[in-house]
Amino acid sequence: LTEVESLFYPWVKQTFYLVYQIVKEKIAASLEKAFSQYGFAEPSVPQLKNACEVSLRTLYKYYPSKEAMIVAALEHRHQRYLSFLLEDAPANGTPTVLHLFTRLEDWMKEFAPNGCMSINALAAYPENLSINQAVKQHKLAVRQLMVQLSQREDLATTLFLLHEGLSNAWPVLGHAAFASAEHTLLELMKENNQ
């Protein structure tokens, strides 16, 4: 490299990397939306390409298989979900846990009327290790968030099971699932604060 080239090379390299990351993130967001809307069995890779508004070559450059596309969608959704849950959350304790469940109901209404996308992915691809790992990491992170915000390690599994029960019952029961979970949650927190 010439002296001039060596001055610009780091800048050019960084710019290409940033563009790569932006495109990758845009594709992951589009994949999340497509899988949420159509499920995992229905969309073919060409349909996913159209949903992402990129060429097939570009799609495969970033995500070389349908399973890799699913993992990207799940990881993108995971980040979005945690941010959504934490938006305007009180500091900690019972009010925070109630807030998380209220946000979960809002999420189910707006983004997941057909149930938990992670569980749906696992049902569609039960033998895929990458998808299994992405779902497991997501679920463990949600459980850890419950512990962190409730400050109740002793209730971690119970709170997590309430969360999972609500998200899985939502497509059938709707708001009734939330109302029941909220009632159980209030009783649980009251009972364990005595």
How would you name each of these model-derived features?
Residues 26, 30-68, 72:
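Helix-turn-helix
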Residues 1-22, 194:
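N-terminal intrinsically disordered/low-complexity leader segments
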Residues 131-136, 140, 149-194:
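Hydrophobic/aromatic-rich alpha-helical bundle segments in the mid-to-C-terminal region
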Residues 108-130:
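Amphipathic alpha-helical segments used for helix-helix packing
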